[in-house]
């Protein structure tokens, strides 16, 4: 019994003498935190990119909604372009009265080219969208139908 008490006393004394982390333990903790931080930065970068693409698609859908408002008060008999930014053609309608300035989520200013083409189709209309920003675009080569808009259609801008 006395021998067992001595062992317990020595174990307790040894535990009392331990005062903190060794340098190796501290280094392991720092390395683990660094790995976790690196993984988090990569994951957050993807989330930010996707949210910018979602914002661009939302802008395109907002332009289509503005075009629908336009056709409600201005019936269209031939294909009409409702322009929100860029160089206006002689027959283009002004869409800026329906939507405030659309900001490019990938740049610092407005989109360089933004319009909706309204095409009569029997007793309804078809809407196609082009939205070009500083780095990304939707329908840069060919305008995209409004019912197919998704973030998968946001591509890198060409011709820079």
Model-derived segments and spans:
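N-terminal leader/signal peptides at the extreme start of proteins
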Residues: 1-19
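N-terminal single-pass transmembrane signal-anchor helix
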Residues: 20-45
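Extracellular/periplasmic head regions of type IV pilus-like filament subunits
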Residues: 77-138, 159
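Aliphatic-rich helix starts adjacent to a transmembrane/signal segment
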Residues: 44-64
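Low-complexity, S/T/G/P-rich flexible repeat/linker segments used as non-globular hinges
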Residues: 135-160
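Flexible interhelical turns and helix-capping residues at alpha-helix boundaries
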Residues: 16, 37, 49-52
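N-terminal alpha-helical signal peptides/signal-anchor transmembrane segments
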Residues: 60-77
């Amino acid at each position: 019994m006395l021998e067992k008490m001595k062992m317990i006393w020595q174990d307790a004394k040894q535990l009392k003498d331990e005062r903190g982390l060794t340098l190796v333990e501290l280094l392991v903790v720092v390395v683990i935190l660094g790995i976790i931080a690196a993984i988090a930065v990569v994951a957050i970068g993807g989330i930010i990119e996707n949210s910018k693409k979602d914002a661009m698609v939302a802008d395109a859908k907002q332009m289509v909604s503005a075009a629908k408002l336009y056709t409600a008060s201005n019936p269209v008999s031939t294909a009409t372009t409702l322009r929100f930014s860029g160089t206006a053609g002689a027959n283009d309608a002004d869409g800026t009265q329906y939507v405030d300035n659309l900001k490019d989520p990938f740049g610092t200013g407005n989109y360089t080219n933004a319009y909706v083409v309204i095409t009569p189709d029997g007793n309804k209309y078809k809407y196609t969208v082009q939205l070009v920003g500083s780095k990304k675009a939707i329908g840069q080569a060919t305008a995209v139908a409004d019912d197919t808009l998704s973030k998968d259609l946001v591509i890198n801008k060409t011709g820079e």
